[in-house]
A protein has these predicted regions:
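Acidic, metal/ion-coordinating pockets
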Residues: 12-261, 305, 311
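A short C-terminal boundary segment appended to hydrolase-like catalytic domains
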Residues: 246-316
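Short, positively charged and aromatic/hydrophobic N-terminal segments
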Residues: 4-12
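Intrinsic disorder/low-structure terminal segments
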Residues: 4-5, 111, 274
Length: 316
């Protein structure tokens, strides 16, 4: 706690308020056509005297975009670095949409810290992620970040992962001495709105749940009991902005907004159009260089589906 002393007839103690801004992105799903205005929104809202923390809630990577497919998500990581993300968790698109070896090396060039508390392999916690993290602000506020992804038990297992019950893991994490010693507990949730509401109703220790997965939107946040909830839709249509004011380790003010990124579209911006076109063309160019098989002729739709199903059966 920072205090100021004023000498005179009586000493006055002024408690310094810790002002924090959290910007959050979720479920981009490689909609890179949204990136130019999303980047401008992040840059604009980063101009603040508050301490700034930027987080991504998962499902950033989606192989539906050819450049994400061709780079196994590494291009997404480069853009996240450019946005200045500090912490990120994973969604099912990273956990299931990528092969295990792809996910294991996805964050090699990341300039941010991945966090995931309910995923492990046969060796335990993934090397590329922390199970939780305590962030200490310049003013001394300790924020415990916990993170969980939706437990698709049957689909994680064939990929070499064990996904754990997020509520059980949350309860265990809340009992950790380092988490109990924190001033604030924030959950980075890729669980969906029902889980988020359950967390808020069950665990008063959690101060804030930043949500994703179900693509829900809380334009001005939500409060359940003493827990705040935030969520910013999908595809980069919104940028979440949370302004916290903390005094003596307690939240005394919380403003939650979902800012429409369409407000940051520049009319007839040729650079944006060129950027979007170039990313798609580069993805197609790289994919065209990857030879999978020599078929002799082009397969029709039914033949392609049959081939895919046969491959799935072989692997399972």
């Amino acid at each position: 706690m920072n205090v100021k002393f004023f000498c005179g007839k009586s000493a006055k103690i002024e408690v310094m308020k810790d002002k924090i801004r959290i910007l959050h992105i979720n479920d981009l799903h490689s909609h890179f056509e949204q990136y130019p205005q999303l980047k401008r929104a992040v840059d604009d809202l980063s101009q603040t005297d508050r301490e700034l923390i930027k987080v991504d809630l998962g499902d950033n990577v989606d192989k539906s975009h050819p450049l994400s497919d061709a780079t196994a998500g590494r291009f997404n990581i480069a853009l996240m670095n450019e946005l200045g993300i500090d912490y990120a968790t994973i969604g099912n698109n990273e956990g299931i949409g990528l092969a295990k070896d792809e996910l294991d090396c996805l964050y090699e060039q990341a300039q941010f810290q991945p966090i995931i508390g309910n995923l492990k392999d046969e060796e335990g916690q993934p090397e590329w992620a922390k199970p939780y993290l305590v962030h200490k602000t310049k003013a001394g506020t300790k924020i415990a970040f916990l993170a969980y992804t939706f437990p698709y038990y049957l689909t994680y297992a064939p990929n070499g992962w064990q996904v754990l019950d997020p509520m059980a893991r949350l309860e265990e994490d809340l009992a950790r001495s380092e988490v109990m010693d924190a001033d604030l507990v924030i959950v980075l949730s890729h669980l969906g709105v029902r889980y988020d509401e359950q967390i808020s109703e069950t665990y008063p220790q959690v101060n804030l749940v930043i949500g994703s997965h179900t693509h829900h939107l809380f334009e001005e946040g939500k409060l359940i009991n003493e827990t705040y909830l935030a969520a910013a839709d999908r595809y980069g249509y919104f940028l979440g902005c949370i302004d916290l004011t903390v005094e003596n380790g307690q939240i005394i003010a919380c403003q939650i907004e979902a800012i429409p990124t369409k407000d940051y579209i520049l009319d007839l911006d040729k650079e944006d159009e060129a950027f979007i076109k170039a990313m798609r063309e580069e993805g197609h160019r790289r994919l065209a260089q990857e030879k999978v098989a020599n078929l002799g002729r082009k397969l029709n739709f039914n033949e392609t589906c049959q081939l895919v199903l046969q491959a799935v059966c072989q692997e399972t």
